[in-house]
Amino acid sequence: MTECKAEVTPSASNGHRVFSYTLESHTAAAFAIMNELRRERQLCDVTLRVRYCPLDTHVDFVAHKVVLASSSPVFRAMFTNGLKECGMEVVPIEGIHPKVMGRLIEFAYTASISVGEKCVIHVMNGAVMYQIDSVVQACCDFLVEQLDPSNAIGIASFAEQIGCTELHQKAREYIYMNFSQVATQEEFFTLSHCQLVTLISRDELNVRCESEVFHACVAWVQYDREERRPYVQALLQAVRCHSLTPHFLQRQLEHFEWDAQSKDYLSQIFRDLTLHKPTKVIPLRTPKVPQLIYTVGGYFRQSLSFLEAFNPCSGAWLRLADLQVPRSGLAACVISGLLYAVGGRNNGPDGNMDSHTLDCYNPMNNCWRPCAHMSVPRNRIGVGVIDGMIYAVGGSHGCTHHNSVERYDPERDSWQLVSPMLTRRIGVGVAVINRLLYAVGGFDGTHRLSSAECYNPERDEWRSIAAMNTVRSGAGVCALGNYIYVMGGYDGTNQLNTVERYDVEKDSWSFSASMRHRRSALGVTTHHGRIYVLGGYDGNTFLDSVECFDPETDSWTEVTHMKSGRSGVGVAVTMEPCHKELIPCQC
């Protein structure tokens, strides 16, 4: 049945009523008839004589000027603005393939077009030439669906040439997100040095480690070594070399033939890193994959196995795969996008057991896997990461308070003891700046501590640094910029809300704005230049609140609440999980 709309308007002042009738299918039916007339060469008033090049054989297309003008601003201008084509029965057209013009004419009559891998570039070129935006959009959507590591650079280049901003942006985003795969494809090696420098300078590059960018640049140079040798220094300056490890740099200096200038540049960076010289803050790669705050384990009447993630941008929480064994007093950290849960204790109805386990969570599949065990159980442990290795610091096993420290190498899945701290510490806070590991506060079995010490991995030795103004165990500790922030904790009498900041260059402590709530055994991390503290214990209650510190304004804001109150939680930041079957938390 033919669809229509009818509307009766109220009587006008003259007493007449108006009946409005719209036949919805009329336009499509009219164009279908016009298309029949075109195919039968009836009532046509123009012939387009199309050939791609002047020497090619032409192909004639008969059509109606009004239909062409209705679908293309170029044809409309051609036939209505007093141009010579207005009075021509045969209009010569060059620069577009006849098959493409045939498809565009067909679209003008039918509003339908088919594109495939072999023809989409030609059709899109033609649609851009004749400003047929709906066809351009269809081709753009098709090409976005076809993006893969082998063609993304070519599609981005094509989009830039024809001025298709949307396609160019989406292709570039694909390249940034999949840089490591794109960098192995033939198209990557056809980039000019200027294009490559621009690409690797982008903050949005999604790489697990800066070594991936370094290796990509070396491979690009090796592809045509003699021609590309002059560009090595420009590439190295664009790579964030201060994010590389000294061991990696040493291997590259030994195994690759560098020119004198590049060798000196890399050697200087190696010296800066191994001498732990303060450097300007290195801008982090910030891929457009959302970075979430993960909370693992914790204590609320008993140890918990929860893994949850908070998105500070949306305010949403996700419930993820639980730990296999509940743990509190654990620590968390991230290496190459993987979340590690270290040590802790299982406080349960059947008793308490300190843990020497290390578990690794992969956001790509929402799964945990066990890793090599530490040499001893460590409850209320502190951890830090230097050169892609985890340092497990202090903690306790029963009545034993550790000063021992061990280091985990993910590539070998093995632990190695390093020099012990000068002081036994449980409830210790740990942070890393300039490849130096800082252990702050804690409890030695007798006293809460204000002391702090610093570990040098090159020398494998600890040294004392300035003590805090306040004794604290179970404080939240993190590095932000060139400062170490210490938040809350327990002084032996009260839970604290005070905050101290350590200046690594001046070896001195000063107070910052206090938190809104007193907290010990809290979780802490940094996210986009701000500090987040989560949960903890205030002396009476297990807290579910989350506060955020802005160093620019020296102020705290309460931003959200966890699903339930808890203390002794491990907290770290990594990418949003890719697993789709996730459970939103009902907070």
Swiss-Prot record:
Primary residence: cytoplasm
Record text on activity regulation: Ubiquitin ligase activity of the BCR(KEAP1) complex is inhibited by oxidative stress and electrophile metabolites such as sulforaphane. Electrophile metabolites react with reactive cysteine residues in keap1 and trigger non-enzymatic covalent modifications of these cysteine residues, leading to inactivate the ubiquitin ligase activity of the BCR(KEAP1) complex.
Repeat positions for Kelch: 292-337, 338-388, 389-435, 436-482, 484-529, 530-576
Coiled coil: none
Pathway where this protein functions: Protein modification; protein ubiquitination
Pfam families, per database record: BACK (PF07707), BTB (PF00651), Kelch_1 (PF01344), Kelch_KLHDC2_KLHL20_DRC7 (PF24681)
All residue ranges annotated as the BACK domain in the record: 153-253
One GO CC term on file: Cul3-RING ubiquitin ligase complex
Residues the record marks as site: Sensor for electrophilic agents: C119, C241, C399
PROSITE patterns referenced in this protein's UniProt entry, alphabetically: BTB
Domain BTB stretches: 44-117
Quaternary data: Homodimer and heterodimer; heterodimerizes with keap1a. Component of the BCR(KEAP1) E3 ubiquitin ligase complex, at least composed of 2 molecules of cul3, 2 molecules of keap1 (keap1a and/or keap1b), and rbx1. Interacts with nfe2l2/nrf2; the interaction is direct.
Entry remark concerning the domains of this protein: Keap1 contains reactive cysteine residues that act as sensors for endogenously produced and exogenously encountered small molecules, which react with sulfhydryl groups and modify the cysteine sensors, leading to impair ability of the BCR(KEAP1) complex to ubiquitinate target proteins.
Function: Substrate-specific adapter of a BCR (BTB-CUL3-RBX1) E3 ubiquitin ligase complex that regulates the response to oxidative stress by targeting nfe2l2/nrf2 for ubiquitination. Keap1 acts as a key sensor of oxidative and electrophilic stress: in normal conditions, the BCR(KEAP1) complex mediates ubiquitination and degradation of nfe2l2/nrf2, a transcription factor regulating expression of many cytoprotective genes.
Name this protein carries in UniProt: Kelch-like ECH-associated protein 1B
Provenance organism: Danio rerio
Encoding gene per record: keap1b
